[in-house]
Amino acid sequence: MTDPVLNVSDVTVARSGDPILQGVSLTVRAGEHWALLGPNGAGKTTLLRMLGALEHPTKGAVEVLGQRLGRVDIRALRAGIGHVDPRHAPSGALTVREVVLTGATNTAGLIPRWQASPEQLAEADRLVDLLGLSHRHNADWQILSQGQRGRTLIARALMPSPRLLLLDEPATGLDLAGREQLLERVDLLQRTHPDLASVLVTHHLEELPPGTTHAMLLRDGRTVAAGAVDEVITTAHISTCFDHPVRILRDEGRWSVRPAQPQLN
């Protein structure tokens, strides 16, 4: 068994005395692809920030890439983490290729007088192609669709060859076509990068890629269930997590939600 990429042990986070997370534990290994689900206010964003070394626990321990938060150079640690936030706003008038290249420097814009190496240019082009944007290499960021922006940001996050990829509601604001194109490419990444671990946050089961291997459900800052995806995303667990009776269906690797009782006309 490989060493954990992430190890969260009995973590509590409190702000102004109010608990945001309570007694949460999680272990993620290389090649695992986790979904983090729960209603608004469940603590998903706070947990994701800790996994990305952007926040520290009030109690408990968090190890990211084998390093314990509080005992490591955070800047060096973040170089091994790819973070995809659809709210990210590139600085300046950049093309798709240039936005992806900012992932090499982990900056919002291109650094003055910085020049990408031939290897970095080749990697940026490879990732743009991999994310299905080969026809948009030189397109301006401002004219991209929301779905194209999302895929560009995933390519950007992969530029430093991270061991861990964090996706914060990547399908937010996408129409049906944009969502499906994004999920198709995320699923492809899971096959082309077999050692990459990922954690994807969402409210919606329909936004989970078929390659999802594990899931954690949060409610009111506590774990409802965590483990292998087929054992966690069940009718009983989802109904409890969202405090609403539903039926969970899975077809060809994708999940959907139906009312617990057939609706009467």
Predicted segments, located by residue:
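The feature captures the beta-strand-to-loop junction immediately N-terminal to the Walker
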Residues: 37-39
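Helix-to-loop junction immediately C-terminal to a conserved catalytic motif
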Residues: 52
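Conserved ABC transporter NBD signature motif
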Residues: 60-70, 77
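Conserved ABC ATPase "signature" region
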Residues: 101, 116-136
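Conserved ABC ATPase signature
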Residues: 140-144
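Conserved catalytic motifs of ABC-family nucleotide-binding domains
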Residues: 161
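Catalytic Walker B motif of ABC-type/P-loop ATPase nucleotide-binding domains
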Residues: 165-169
